[in-house]
């Protein structure tokens, strides 16, 4: 299964944030950049797992709620910020339309993510299972998604 990059509608995340303050906001500032991530199916529900651009701190991070893309050199996937998604709330990212430097990063991230797609799926499913069964360490549970999964079911 090839993993692709998606963006998510800001209106949808704004709606979820009304009920769950842990739902991340889009990056704004000098250059508006929507959240980019992957979509995974976990127990018959779809989840959007956002990625984070490379930062020095990623190189030394060790936690079960992240996946380090190329050992953190290319960023991370933040499983702790996964949100449930519905069809129409997320859209395939056309990497070819991105700025050259950013396009290069996205292609490299895509290569690593697709080489390790099975591992990524296992991490997401394990974290989700630990969360719903109340087996996550408290310091990780406090970072993870909250009511947004319930809300997603209620708006379907």
Language-model features: where?
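Residue-level detector of flexible, active-site-proximal loop/helix-junction positions
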Residues: 12, 55, 89
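Short beta-strand-centered aromatic/proline hotspots
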Residues: 35-39
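Residues at the C-termini of beta-strands that transition into short coil/loop
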Residues: 9, 52, 86
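GIY-YIG nuclease catalytic motif and its immediate N-terminal context
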Residues: 1-31
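A broad, low-specificity signal marking well-ordered, structured residues that form hydrophobic/aromatic
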Residues: 4-6, 46, 77-83
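C-terminal terminal-subdomain/extension
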Residues: 70-156
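Compact nucleic-acid interaction/catalytic patches
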Residues: 28-30, 41-78
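A short secondary-structure junction signal
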Residues: 17-19, 49-50, 94
